Amino acid sequence: MSDKTFLVEIGTEELPPKALRSLAESFAANVTAELDNAGLTHGKIEWFAAPRRLALKVANLAASQADREVEKRGPAISQAFDAEGKPSKAAEGWARGCGITVDQAERLTTDKGEWLLYRAHVKGESAEALLPNMIATSLAKLPIPKLMRWGASDVHFVRPVHTVTLLLGDTVIPATILGIQSDRVIRGHRFMGEPEFTIDNADQYPQILLERGKVIADYELRKAKIKADAEEAARKIGGNADLSESLLEEVTSLVEWPVVLTAKFEEKFLAVPAEALVYTMKGDQKYFPVYANDGKLLPNFIFVANIESKDPIQIISGNEKVVRPRLADAEFFFNTDRKKRLEDHLPRLQTVLFQQQLGTLRDKTDRIAELSGWIAREIGADVNHATRAGLLSKCDLMTNMVFEFTDTQGVMGMHYARHDGEAEDVAVALNEQYQPRFAGDDLPSNPVACAVAIADKMDTLAGIFGIGQHPKGDKDPFALRRAALGVLRIIVEKNLSLDLQTLTEEAVRLYGDKLTNAKVVDEVIDFMLGRFRAWYQDEGYTVDTIQAVLARRPTRPADFDARMKAVSHFRTLEAASALAAANKRVSNILAKSDETLNERVNAATLKEPEEIALALQVVVLRDKLEPFFAEGRYQEALVELAELREVIDAFFEKVMVNVEDKDLRINRLSMLEKLRELFLRVADISLLQ
């Protein structure tokens, strides 16, 4: 039998749009693994996903597994039979497992002895017999957080299932999947094309669905069409569509036959901050906003219909009517909120709990204000502006706009602060206090904003760790991992002179007696250093490079970064491998010694030329490198230390360290300790592999 194309399509009710891609990709990965594990050879595997279907098409699928020879060695002959030649229980159990009797077994003779042997020719199973279970298993492994049950059956899936199509070439594979008997029936678009039709051959998919069912099953093709049509629609009205990836993905997952249309809203709504209008259009309505070439929002939006209407004007008008009340709400909230100053909301923060043991949002803003001022002083920012921004940082949470449109927190604080006449860096800080919100997000743009962003995150870290509620496993309800990484990114990428030790101590101090964890400072610092590990691994640094720096526990993030770059560069040097090995040897020698070493190397005790040369080099470099260490010039320091390779190699080749002469032994150990201390000023080089 020749290879054939295999098709599986699961026809469902509307699938969750934000999960559609991951469901389809996981389905493809699961089926691929099942085929490979079963030894069924195949060609390209394509996945298809639309709101009411998941499908896979496998090219050149083998008709069956290859036949194979099976050999199973049993017990040694000496243990397979007793003195009378009767099979032992071990032999009988082995034979039973192979489906034979002991006397049917062959014997395997080698130079090491003789064993019972089972040998068989196993015929490969057909793909038709294997596929139903493979598909069922693959569907059961999909990442579905919440399953549904429908009708009177006990079947569970992400959404109710109506059709299951299993075709191998032109043959239907009989099976019951998710409670549905397989067939060659496929359902088309709800309102266009044929509602239901049969497919004769797997190779006809997805073209037959496009032509007869009016469904673009190819997810990437559908997405590309929406993107291209939306860009063209925006160009026609002299603008650029805001086609954010997340919304583009969601809209792609909502439609089977995308028709891009352009609509408008009243220009008076442009007086409302663009962020609020965009939040309404994108978040609530799944519309694409349109911007002019100068970056200003236009009174237009682009949306995607799931039907090709004979009267698109009606659809456009309907969407304009839907969005208008939402924009009118935003306008009302904006005008109402501006009747009060931001600071007028401070008393209401006392009514909102931050955390049961840690007090209210007003308590938190007071701490943020003081900590922001302290940080500003450390980094040379405007202390008064930072303190003011910290005090106002959560006031916009009490406004009507943010209550209704929660994602506008921060940005509305900025607009209201500008309206109140606050300093510009204060206003900007209110918006940027939450940055970076995710990996790769922008950092705060000015020093005051940096101070407030760090203060907000450090207050949360200190408080939650201070009551013993640090993240456990995958659970991180207060987003402490994101907060820690955000603080580190700001300090490193803005090159701020902040020390995690004093920063954490100050954040903890501001809580007074609210915290119950006596180890809170150390735990917060260790947690943040752990975030460094994840960050630098993502940046491509090797694990041992990170461990070498972490071993020194540097608490200044900018200093940590400088050490990482220095060690990474050191690894490119020709002497790096030998020096890492030498450091490891020195470390092991010192670890095995329990003797009290000298504070200084006694020059008079030195005997061998090689130890004299090494001692001299250590003294010279110690003095020479002190300014390097003080200024954080770690890369230059390690380059200088790399020059020690030859004298270190010569020392270990010619000099015995653990000699019987105690004074000589201790002097040599002391010299090695001084040598190791030089490298440890940067990192623990002995940990490099």
From Swiss-Prot:
Entry keyword set: Aminoacyl-tRNA synthetase, ATP-binding, Cytoplasm, Ligase, Nucleotide-binding, Protein biosynthesis
GO terms of biological process kind: arginyl-tRNA aminoacylation; glycyl-tRNA aminoacylation
Keyword Cell membrane: no
Main location: cytoplasm
Catalytic activity of the protein: tRNA(Gly) + glycine + ATP = glycyl-tRNA(Gly) + AMP + diphosphate
Molecular-function GO term, any one: glycine-tRNA ligase activity
Any one of the GO CC terms: cytosol
Enzyme Commission number(s) from the entry: 6.1.1.14
UniProt key word Ion transport: no
Protein family (similarity comment): Belongs to the class-II aminoacyl-tRNA synthetase family.
Record's protein name: Glycine--tRNA ligase beta subunit
Species name: Enterobacter sp. (strain 638)
Gene that encodes it: glyS
